Amino acid sequence: TMIDNLMKQSGSFRENEVVDERLMDSGELEKERGITILAKPASIDWQGSRINIIDTPGHRDFAAEVERVLSMADGALLLIDSAEGVMPQTKFVLAKALKQGLKPIVVINKLDKADQRANEVLDETFDLFVSLDANEEQLDFPVLYASGRSGWADKEVDGPRENLHPLLDLIMEHVKPAELDKTKPFAMLSTLLYADSFLGRSLVGRISQGTAKANQPIKAINLKGEKVDEGKLTKIFRYEGTKKVPIEIGEAGD
């Protein structure tokens, strides 16, 4: 629901467009249980920039999925329930993010709960960072208090509770885009391979350098640098909102 409202408030949808709730939970089990099982990408346009978002599972049963997602990220939002506080899955995901060198933004969420204890939860969160050997930069994490369902975020517990713009602004300020070279040969770290009934084999990932065009020959290599497959790109897509949109050229960072 947090991402749903981020998209709505950033103008990712037309005013008359009908939007389902829990956009990022597309599977039946995900919608039923309110959990994320498979990582899903989306994007938001904000103040002339594109923010790519990957909703990741939070449970250790999906460890490989979490690691693949974090390898594509420049930053992370760590959402923590203002009543339940730090959970086992919080520790698991945060440990992975810190190991990747990410500097998370902490969001104490669900502040509209009657039993919220935001200040205590923030202390618990700081203790968790310390226990996971976060460095000084990671320990100096920014904090927002929010209600994803109601669609607001503030720097203070008793803030005006108007919208999620403070969160979007903080992402722009705190998460620095990686310096990627568009002039080098094309390379992409693929995090998901699936079969599309119309397009055939499809890859989801982040272009780490160079550019990608249709009909461009490519090679797949393993972690040892050995070629394991080859072929050509037939179509290039980019996420706009939650929809895949065809583009002529994919560039480093897409």
Feature-to-residue mapping (PLM):
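Structural and coupling elements of P-loop NTPases
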Residues: 1-254
